[in-house]
Amino acid sequence: MIQTETMLDVADNSGARRVQCIKVLGGSHRRYASVGDIIKVTVKEAIPRARVKKGDVMNAVVVRTKFGIRRPDGSVIRFDDNAAVILNNNKAPIATRIFGPVTRELRIEQFMKIISLAPEVL
């Protein structure tokens, strides 16, 4: 469950290391975002000479949450961190690599490019 002011790790090679959620998209008073939801983020930490700079405002999709997600069979998948992948204006990832596992729920949300780049899909 990601909400405004939540800090997330970046799970791609866009150059950003940490981002902060500044808005949960998808409704006028929507409070929480889960895996597969698009959020508006600002870059808080970035490596030098990267595609994104500190202070940039971007869209991102949540790929891992500590809160976890419940599957229809009753199982729950939780991760050790909250992580997101930075998107461009066309809802495509700006990075060429994804780090760490992602969940199958991204397939339902039409993020096939992220699933194909990910090393592991749970």
UniProtKB/Swiss-Prot annotation:
Family: Belongs to the universal ribosomal protein uL14 family.
UniProt protein name: Large ribosomal subunit protein uL14
Keyword check for Ribosomal protein: yes
GO cellular component: cytosolic large ribosomal subunit
GO biological process, one term: translation
Subunit comment: Part of the 50S ribosomal subunit. Forms a cluster with proteins L3 and L19. In the 70S ribosome, L14 and L19 interact and together make contacts with the 16S rRNA in bridges B5 and B8.
Keyword Mitochondrion on entry: no
Role of this protein: Binds to 23S rRNA. Forms part of two intersubunit bridges in the 70S ribosome.
Organism: Acinetobacter baumannii (strain SDF)
Keywords linked to the UniProt accession: Ribonucleoprotein, Ribosomal protein, RNA-binding, rRNA-binding
One Gene Ontology MF term: structural constituent of ribosome
